[in-house]
Amino acid sequence: MCRIVGAPRTLLPLLAALLQASVEASGGIALCKTGFPEDVYSAVLSQDVHEGQPLLNVKFSNCNGKRKVQYESSEPADFKVDEDGMVYAVRSFPLSSEHAKFLIYAQDKETQEKWQVAVKLSLKPNLPEDSVKESQEIEEIVFPRQLMKHNGHLQRQKRDWVIPPINLPENSRGPFPQELVRIRSDRDKNLSLRYSVTGPGADQPPTGIFIINPISGQLSVTKPLDRELIARFHLRAHAVDINGNQVENPIDIVINVIDMNDNRPEFLHQVWNGTVPEGSKPGTYVMTVTAIDDDDPNTLNGMLRYRILSQAPSTPSPNMFTINNETGDIITVAAGLDREKVQQYMLIIQATDTEGSPTYGLSNTATAVITVTDVNDNPPEFTAMSFYGEVPENRVDVIVANLTVTDKDQPHTPAWNAVYRISGGDPTGRFAIQTDPNSNDGLVTVVKPIDFETNRMFVLTVAAENQVPLAKGIQHPPQSTATVSVTVIDVNENPYFAPNPKIIRQEEGLHAGTMLTTFTAQDPDRYMPQNIRYTKLSDPANWLKIDPVNGQITTIAVLDRESPNVKNNIYNATFLASDNGIPPMSGTGTLQIYLLDINDNAPQVVPQEAETCETPDPNSINITALDYDIDPNAGPFAFDLPLSPVTIKRNWTITRLNGDFAQLNLKIKFLEAGIYEVPIIITDSGNPPKSNISILRVKVCQCDSNGDCTDVDRIVGAGLGTGAIIAILLCIIILLILVLMFVVWMKRRDKERQAKQLLIDPEDDVRDNILKYDEEGGGEEDQDYDLSQLQQPDTVEPDAIKPVGIRRLDERPIHAEPQYPVRSAAPHPGDIGDFINEGLKAADNDPTAPPYDSLLVFDYEGSGSTAGSLSSLNSSSSGGEQDYDYLNDWGPRFKKLADMYGGGDD
């Protein structure tokens, strides 16, 4: 069993801490200063220091919490400091004066700013033996005694009390390590024991807070505790012999961290927002503010109280609100909230712990912003009692007046938005009032046309309201009602026909000049004397005319119900009525003539072509009648054959099947194949009836056993129409013109070709030495030409000295050529035929000449030409002496030129 001796001494640190907290609370809170809060840290140790033994904790004040600090020791061989500020022994050594004092450095990792603090270690004083014994008896926890039972097993001695927890105040100032209690076993008299503790705070995170001397069993705390981090530590103490064998069962040690008032209350929000309607009664709930305190809520340190420090503005009362000091509920305590006077209140709220003690409590403040919301306590009022406007007649969607109002309520809220209504002066609903969402003005608009001739002025009574009803007890003043006077302006209106359309019934076939009706228009402008004139706007068949003054409509052609311009027996014509107002206006009217049918169309046979066999059997021809008239001037029809020619009734017979159909058959046993025109008399049922002889073209053909014609030809019309004949003639004429133009063009091209040939071949042309070089075709002949053998004379050499070699195909042969007599004169230019014949004769008489009229290749001629330079040519009139004998070497093409310049006097 364990026991605790000297409880009063154990409570001394707690009482000292409470006294210290009271002094701090009374003195206020000092400003935070970064660095070590102490100038010197002290620790009292025993003679021997073991490796890894925690010695003390140096606390660094990090105000903003953002600094990353690393610690160093001035004696790194003996002491080290972890990141939490706990100082450990690096090695085991006996504590002496040389280790009594050293420095601890703290350096900011980012800014490299550095702080230092001194650490002083002192030896535990050597107390007399009696004093040690007394001290050990006072602060000991003894392991429970164990009795040996008869069976050899240990049995714990029963006790009627348990080990009470150790109460340790947070934020103790030390010195550290601070001794708490001594743990010992009754068996230490006979055995050499070693003590240890386990659990969170010892060998489990956070490690190193509690340490125990393994020899003496002295349990100590190495640093200040923080209840807000860990409120209770649960440790287990162990006792083993030097061999590590357990000699006592572990005992539980509970250390409670006593709360100190070291945390100020903190509001959840620094600014709180709330609303309250204007005109609220006292006691109206507004909002709730809340603060929290990290201290123990079951003690005075965590019990908060609220109060209002100030109110701004202080009108109409400096105490418009109050706060529940325990819950933080803010309520109204005075009447007179008016948004139009004060729209917002700002309250400074204070929360204080220790139940609001002004002496020992810590406090904090926040701001409560209370907005006074609007209610509809101000009706809209017109800025004037009367408004005026004007509008042209027959205009709609026109704003005629702008109504302005004032409202003291909050803009653009239902209590401010105006709604206008017309309470009188508009029984037919011709006006409406819309609200401008931006300006809140009322826009009086015309929604139905107004006729000046009916109403010249309107006096409207209008009222203005809000979208929500007025607050209770508030009435609409007279300023919420006004009058609007609207003047209607007369404008020139369109004349109008009445009725429109106008329908009349007339029989077709009326002769031209018949007066049908009078179609006049009315002018709605009764107060504007004006004249109206009429014109025809649409008359598809051009049957009608209208008198421009009186509007009488007369026919100018025969009305025909069967006209394509008549739809469903109705003919539509449109007329225009125009006045002489400023500006002139016009209106249109439609006259619908319902044409009654008369029997003016004779029936016709349908179909107009048919075919039948040479014998009466096996088929017949079914026919019917087409009549453009309608009942009763159409069917039933009567079908008959004429008496003349007599062959009709002799060859054919017709049988009436019903009122619309009849059957045509051969009367004789055989009729030769061919095309026959059979006249048929068809009579309708009109009054009087109308008859017509209609021709049916019948093709009589040979038939097979099924009664089908074996001929493939069909009935073709006996003749062509005039239009077809004209078209065919035009096509023939166009083709003839095209052929004639082609022939003329061919003849002209032949003449041009002959003229070009004359410029090259004739003997009397002085330009025969000009050749055409635009064709440069060629093959292997010009590629194999030996260019080294080309003659390049600067002057024409005699034939005798010309070297023999490869010659050009167009060069005159070396051997002698026949000489032709020189003609005295060139033929007459007009005698083209003789000129050509003479040229042909001269060419044919030269048996040695190659075919010089063939296509030659002139793609390459060496560095010079046998013709020499043309710039050396001079006429005989120049008087220069020239040698033209070389012209004789150019062949028969240039014989005429050689005769002219080198052949004698001519």
UniProtKB/Swiss-Prot annotation:
The chain crosses the membrane at residues 725-745. PANTHER family: CADHERIN-2, CADHERIN-23. Keywords: Calcium, Cell adhesion, Cell junction, Cell membrane, Cleavage on pair of basic residues, Glycoprotein, Membrane, Metal-binding, Phosphoprotein, Repeat, Signal, Transmembrane, Transmembrane helix. Calcium-dependent cell adhesion protein; preferentially mediates homotypic cell-cell adhesion by dimerization with a CDH2 chain from another cell. Cadherins may thus contribute to the sorting of heterogeneous cell types. Acts as a regulator of neural stem cells quiescence by mediating anchorage of neural stem cells to ependymocytes in the adult subependymal zone: upon cleavage by MMP24, CDH2-mediated anchorage is affected, leading to modulate neural stem cell quiescence. Residues 160-267, 268-382, 383-497, 498-603, 604-714 form the Cadherin domain. Residues 26-159 form a propeptide. Residues 863-884 are annotated as: Disordered. SUPFAM superfamilies: Cadherin-like. This is Cadherin-2. GO terms for molecular function: beta-catenin binding; cadherin binding; calcium ion binding. Ca(2+) 2 binds at residues 170, 228, 259-260, 262, 295. Ca(2+) 3 binds at residues 261, 263, 293, 301, 353. Glycans are attached at residues 190, 273, 325, 402, 572, 622, 651, 692. Pfam families: CADH_Y-type_LIR, Cadherin, Cadherin_pro. The keyword Phosphoprotein applies. Homodimer (via extracellular region). Can also form heterodimers with other cadherins (via extracellular region). Dimerization occurs in trans, i.e. with a cadherin chain from another cell. Interacts with CDCP1. Interacts with PCDH8; this complex may also include TAOK2. The interaction with PCDH8 may lead to internalization through TAOK2/p38 MAPK pathway. Identified in a complex containing FGFR4, NCAM1, CDH2, PLCG1, FRS2, SRC, SHC1, GAP43 and CTTN. May interact with OBSCN (via protein kinase domain 2). Interacts with FBXO45. GO terms for cellular component: adherens junction; apical part of cell; catenin complex; cell surface; cell-cell junction; cytoplasm; desmosome; intercalated disc. It comes from the Eukaryota. It is found in: Cell membrane; Cell membrane, Sarcolemma; Cell junction; Cell surface. Cleaved by MMP24. Ectodomain cleavage leads to the generation of a soluble 90 kDa N-terminal soluble fragment and a 45 kDa membrane-bound C-terminal fragment 1 (CTF1), which is further cleaved by gamma-secretase into a 35 kDa. Cleavage in neural stem cells by MMP24 affects CDH2-mediated anchorage of neural stem cells to ependymocytes in the adult subependymal zone, leading to modulate neural stem cell quiescence. Three calcium ions are usually bound at the interface of each cadherin domain and rigidify the connections, imparting a strong curvature to the full-length ectodomain. Calcium-binding sites are occupied sequentially in the order of site 3, then site 2 and site 1. It is a single-pass type I membrane protein. Residues 160-724 are extracellular.
